[in-house]
Amino acid sequence: MSLDIKKPNITKTKKKKTGFVVKMQLNNNRGGNKRNIFIFFFFRNYYTWILWFCLSLYFFTSYFSVEDQSSPSSIRLLSNHKTSSSLPSRALIESSAIKTTSIGLFTGMKIYVYDLPASYNDDWVTASDRCASHLFAAEVAIHRALLSSDVRTLDPDEADYFFVPVYVSCNFSTSNGFPSLSHARSLLSSAVDFLSDHYPFWNRSQGSDHVFVASHDFGACFHAMEDMAIEEGIPKFMKRSIILQTFGVKYKHPCQEVEHVVIPPYIPPESVQKAIEKAPVNGRRDIWAFFRGKMEVNPKNISGRFYSKGVRTAILKKFGGRRRFYLNRHRFAGYRSEIVRSVFCLCPLGWAPWSPRLVESAVLGCVPVVIADGIQLPFSETVQWPEISLTVAEKDVRNLRKVLEHVAATNLSAIQRNLHEPVFKRALLYNVPMKEGDATWHILESLWRKLDDRSYRRSRVLSQREVDM
């Protein structure tokens, strides 16, 4: 026995009820308040779109309210340019890749630039245009940028630092075209004697608040060969000063046993711009792994040392005939046009750990592959190099192809995206006049950070001045 129970048609009942309500509203408002009817139907039909609009507006305004609370300098560095990078990429850059300090904070720091006789600086540029454009020309660029900088003071009594503009890397007297440093120590010693005779500031602090540039192989040791650099060491009269040098390692080394800042080598900004303008229109990089430079098939034993510790020779022998490796031992003036076509740019050590390839590859969008154990990269406290480069141990150079293939299959696109951020290019290039966030600006930031640590020296100087008065 079964009961045949018919369920009421709920849907139809609801529809009729709804229709009845609407009819009542229509009848009650006929010839009267038609606006209420419009509002009712508008919200009934478009409430989903209205809800999405309100939520979007909320998240949009919340994003910018958070942005306003971020580092002002980081925002300015990123807001002055248009970028096609995604929001996650931008967040990565702002949070970790570049840590910056607002330029306004530099207003409390003053630098006095000595007006030395031209024989210490300008005469070298007059003798050779290369003095202001070759890879060691940071000494010229920094000097020129400081002359027009807001931190410069014409009153030495209010200075926190004293900049000594001596160009030691412009003596192009060698047969290979590289500058000789044989005169560097005597030229610097002569400059210090001049300061001691004509100004009271060097003697007052023993040079501890004076800044020099050493933009060549082994920095403050002023020698191109490491064994000789170590043997001669840092000139005694400079051991209390601050050295801006391209040489830097993470381990103890006689040539950096002085207060110093590791800076990038000089690359002319105009040459970078020209290379970018001549890059393939489609942005295609048809060279997978690139290196052009000195590579010895049979490296010579020079005082027990081999050029590049044999790393470049190992690269040549292992990958010289490989299709995906573009290796060339000969010089080519237009080699930057090859960098903009390359995915990976090999940066092995030479006699010294650093090379201009580090900067050239990074600013031209080619991933720098650093092969130099223990190297200290420029501005490592502010520029997060792991975000824009690879590091391969010297002992692993024979596995280089596998390393690059792994990166290409995993995080290559993220590294390339970071490299395209203008903040990186700006941090590694020198401009005259200085631009916020460029290489000279980061040098000033490093000096500014040192002020607290050096405040006792400043107070000591002021106390001594009062005694003298």
UniProtKB/Swiss-Prot annotation:
Disruption phenotype: No visible phenotype.
GO terms (BP aspect): cell wall organization; protein glycosylation
Xref: InterPro entries: Exostosin, Exostosin_GT47
EC number: 2.4.1.-
Membrane topology (Lumenal): 58-469
One of the Pfam families matching this protein, by short name: Exostosin_GT47
TM regions (residue ranges): 37-57
Swiss-Prot/TrEMBL keywords: Cell wall biogenesis/degradation, Glycoprotein, Glycosyltransferase, Golgi apparatus, Membrane, Signal-anchor, Transferase, Transmembrane, Transmembrane helix
Family: Belongs to the glycosyltransferase 47 family.
The protein's name: Probable glucuronoxylan glucuronosyltransferase F8H
Organism: Arabidopsis thaliana (Mouse-ear cress)
Native organism taxonomy: Eukaryota, Viridiplantae, Streptophyta, Embryophyta, Tracheophyta
